[in-house]
A protein has these predicted regions:
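A short, surface-exposed loop/turn module that caps and links secondary-structure elements
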Residues: 32-58
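Enriched for short, Lys/Arg-rich terminal
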Residues: 61-64, 69-99
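Residue-level signal for beta-strand positions within conserved beta-sheet cores that form or flank
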Residues: 2-4, 41, 55, 75-78
Length: 99
C-alpha cells in the first residue's frame, strides 16, 4: 500500500495553529485520507467539477471547509486552505483564476 504525503499551504498551517480544536480534526482527517483513499467515504468530501482542475476536493467539518488537491502520480495531498464556508469559496475563485 502506498501512503500519500500531505503538504499544507502556509494559509492552511496558519489556520490549524490558530484554531486548535477544529484544526486537529482536519489534521486527523487528512492523515486518514493519506493512509488510505478509501477513507474518503467516511468524511463529507465532494469533488469540484472544473474543466481546469479535475482533482480538487473540499472536506467539510462543521462550518469549515478545506480545499485540497489529490495528485495521484506524486502520491500527494495538497491542502490549499481551511476557512469558514463563506470565505473558502471566495478564496477558491481567486486560486483557480490566478493560475
Amino acid at each position: 500500500m502506498n501512503f500519500y504525503k500531505i503538504k499544507y499551504s502556509k494559509a492552511a498551517e496558519k489556520f490549524i495553529k490558530k484554531n486548535k480544536a477544529i484544526g486537529i480534526r482536519f489534521f486527523k482527517a487528512f492523515e486518514e485520507l493519506a493512509e488510505d483513499r478509501e477513507n474518503i467515504k467516511f468524511y463529507d468530501v465532494k469533488k469540484f467539477y472544473s474543466k481546469t482542475y479535475e482533482d480538487i476536493f473540499r472536506l467539510r467539518i462543521g462550518d469549515y471547509r478545506a480545499v485540497f488537491r489529490i495528485i495521484d502520480n506524486e502520491l500527494l495531498i495538497y491542502v490549499f486552505d481551511i476557512a469558514s464556508r463563506g470565505d473558502i469559496y471566495k478564496k477558491l475563485n481567486v486560486w483557480l483564476f490566478e493560475k
